């Protein structure tokens, strides 16, 4: 595939001056700088004495929680016992999962069902996938289920009553009554229609009543917007109220080293259907792609989310021998400067969070944690750190101890120099504690609905849906059964939660050591899922390339796998995003602000008047040039 010369993928966004500034605050520079300093002692000001001082061996700091008589005696026996039990339970868990897979393959997926399923898995486009999904629904008799409104997982009587009222008032043009009904029903998960179970009984679509209700709600909101039925003040208050109750949707891209590159396919599938939310968060490897999306318009992304993007991951890191030498010299496999140069393309140079928001209207969030053990995680965005340079936050979010050293966040000063943020405090990989920062997103941006693209290989084994998941129903007993039968699912749940119990014991009793000065106990015990969780299908050989950039062929496969994993979720996402976009459109009608709009006018996130004032004030405050003492 030939790429036009003027394409976005051929541009270079390296800013050498910023790289030189950043280099002054890296661990390697500090070490070399300290070696050049000649330290002396003196008896008095006129009689200096060059004294050979033998440096004392550094001792680890004491932790008051780990002091005591019994702790050092029982710690290692308890940890050995806990790990032994955990290993045994994990072995039984894998055996049960193997039984469930064999049960489904040999008993459920046979004959015509297996043929239709294979065709579904081979679909390359969403239109092709949807056609084959409907054929599979027809084979399993799911069409009859869609026509029957009765279902225990949502309030079908309430939804039916509201749907009838919307149709009646709109056709009779009773606008005051229509507004009263909209005030009641335009809210998150009204009547349970945002329940994932509604989309977990079929391969495509859901209850016809739910689809009719969403379509009617869409028509009513379009009528209010297009016909201007109310005064500007009434309309503004109405859509502010809708937005507060309905909330926003966030796209969360997890970490996972090179596994995170599978997010490219997820993003491509959402982009093709114009369903990328305006609130996006990324951690570790996911932060790199989140930055790419939030610094480009939709037209630019169509040129970038292709296999040829693999060339931008390449960096001069050398072979394994070079990486080993670098590790013994610096304590990390990768060099911060080379990483910064690579990241600059994805972040469109040295854009700050505020500049990226003004350019695309998308809200970028990067999760990082301070390098010390006990400080709380930090979510970097245009509100909390408007002048922070995006690539520095992305590198910090990728800084896994031993792989990349913790780095300071870099901020654009009043004179446009880069200076360290937060007095040079260093940050590292946010996925060690908060891979998916849902609570922070809800607090700062009123996020009520989350789409999580999860690629962390160490937690994939824990994700199992005994009653099916969105777009992937249980085929046993026409969706009314359990995966592997009730006994198989019951054993899976028991063993999984027993493993989690032992992990909690290890963390609560502080049995786990802290290698490289990092608390690793939360790696398995976070919340890794969302309202919708997308799991791209990975390959075992991906572990071999876990710290390597992709080739064009590998990235092509990853894009296809990411899209295939996203296709089953698009109906659910579209039902939510359709209403959310109309609410945003209604809010923007009477607020012609440049903030929150893309430069091409195609996307954007409107904010309340208070949000706009805060953003403008934050963007006008630039830190002064100060020297940070390292």
Swiss-Prot record:
Signal peptide: none annotated. PROSITE patterns: PNPLA (PS51635). The keyword Hydrolase applies. One of its GO terms (cellular component) is cytoplasm. It is an enzyme of class 3 (hydrolase). It catalyses: a triacylglycerol + H2O = a diacylglycerol + a fatty acid + H(+). One of its GO terms (molecular function) is triacylglycerol lipase activity. Residues 251-442 form the PNPLA domain. Its EC number is 3.1.1.3. The active site is at 284 (nucleophile), 429 (proton acceptor). It is found in: Lipid droplet. Pfam families: DUF3336, Patatin. CDD domains: Pat_PLPL (cd07232). One of its GO terms (biological process) is cellular detoxification. Keywords: Hydrolase, Lipid degradation, Lipid droplet, Lipid metabolism. A motif (GXSXG) lies at residues 282-286. It comes from the Eukaryota. Disulfide bonds: none annotated. The keyword Lipid metabolism applies. Belongs to the PLPL family. Lipid particle-localized triacylglycerol (TAG) lipase. The lipid droplet/particle is a lipid storage compartment which serves as a depot of energy and building blocks for membrane lipid biosynthesis. Involved in the mobilization of the non-polar storage lipids triacylglycerols (TAGs) from lipid particles by hydrolysis of TAGs, releasing and supplying specific fatty acids to the appropriate metabolic pathways. This is Triacylglycerol lipase ptl2. It comes from Schizosaccharomyces pombe (strain 972 / ATCC 24843) (Fission yeast). The gene is ptl2.
């Amino acid at each position: 595939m030939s790429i036009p010369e003027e394409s976005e993928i051929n541009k270079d966004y390296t800013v050498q001056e910023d790289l030189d500034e950043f280099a002054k605050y890296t661990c390697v520079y500090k070490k070399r700088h300290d070696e050049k300093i000649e330290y002396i002692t003196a008896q008095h000001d006129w009689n200096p004495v060059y004294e050979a001082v033998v440096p004392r061996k550094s001792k680890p700091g004491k932790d008051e929680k780990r002091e005591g008589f019994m702790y050092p005696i029982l710690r290692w026996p308890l940890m050995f016992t806990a790990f032994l039990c955990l290993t045994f339970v994990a072995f039984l868990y894998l055996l049960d999962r193997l039984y469930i897979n064999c049960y489904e393959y040999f008993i459920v997926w046979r004959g015509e069902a297996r043929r239709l399923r294979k065709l579904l898995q081979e679909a390359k486009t969403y239109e092709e996938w949807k056609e084959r999904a409907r054929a599979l629904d027809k084979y399993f008799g799911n069409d009859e289920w869609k026509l029957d409104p009765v279902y225990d997982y949502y309030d079908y009587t309430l939804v039916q009553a509201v749907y009838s009222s919307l149709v009646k008032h709109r056709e009779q043009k009773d606008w005051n009554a229509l507004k009263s009904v909209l005030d009641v029903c335009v809210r998150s998960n009204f009547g349970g229609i945002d329940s994932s179970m509604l989309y977990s009984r079929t391969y495509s679509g859901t209850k016809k009543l739910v689809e009719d209700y969403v379509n009617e709600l869409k028509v009513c909101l379009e009528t209010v917007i297009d016909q201007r039925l109310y005064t500007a003040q009434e309309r503004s208050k109405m859509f502010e109220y809708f937005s507060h109750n309905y909330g926003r949707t966030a796209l969360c891209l997890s970490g996972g080293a090179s596994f995170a590159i599978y997010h490219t396919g997820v993003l491509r599938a959402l982009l093709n259907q114009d369903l990328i939310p305006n609130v996006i968060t990324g951690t570790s490897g996911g932060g790199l792609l989140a930055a790419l999306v939030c610094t480009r318009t939709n037209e630019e992304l169509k040129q970038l989310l292709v296999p040829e993007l693999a060339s931008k991951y390449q960096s001069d890191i050398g072979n394994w021998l070079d990486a080993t030498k670098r590790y013994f010299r610096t304590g990390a496999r990768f060099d911060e400067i080379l990483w910064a140069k690579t990241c600059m393309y994805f972040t469109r140079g040295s854009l700050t969070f505020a500049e990226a928001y003004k350019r695309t209207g998308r809200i970028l969030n990067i999760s990082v944690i301070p390098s010390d053990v006990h400080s709380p995680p930090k979510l970097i965005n245009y509100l909390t750190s408007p002048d922070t340079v995006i690539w520095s936050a992305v590198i910090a979010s990728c800084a896994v101890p031993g792989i990349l050293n913790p780095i300071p966040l870099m901020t654009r000063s009043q004179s446009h120099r880069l200076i360290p943020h937060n007095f040079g405090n260093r940050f590292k990989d946010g996925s060690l504690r908060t891979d998916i920062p849902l609570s922070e997103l809800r607090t700062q941006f009123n996020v009520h609905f989350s789409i999580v693209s999860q690629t962390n290989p160490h937690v994939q084994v824990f994700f199992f849906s005994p009653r099916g998941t969105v777009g992937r129903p249980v085929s046993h007993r026409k969706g009314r059964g359990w995966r592997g039968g009730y006994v198989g699912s019951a054993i899976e749940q028991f063993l999984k939660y027993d493993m989690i119990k032992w992990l909690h014991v290890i963390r609560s009793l502080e049995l786990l050591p802290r290698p490289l000065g990092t608390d690793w106990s939360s790696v398995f015990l976070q919340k890794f899922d969302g309202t919708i969780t997308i799991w791209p299908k990975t390959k075992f050989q991906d572990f071999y390339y876990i710290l390597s950039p992709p080739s064009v062929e590998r990235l092509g496969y990853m894009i296809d796998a990411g899209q295939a994993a996203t296709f089953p979720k698009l109906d659910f996402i579209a039902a939510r995003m359709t209403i959310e976009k109309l609410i945003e459109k209604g809010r923007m009608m009477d607020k012609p602000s440049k903030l929150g709009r893309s430069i091409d006018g195609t996307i954007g996130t409107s904010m309340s008047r208070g949000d706009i004032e805060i953003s403008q004030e934050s963007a006008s405050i630039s830190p002064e040039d100060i020297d940070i003492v390292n």
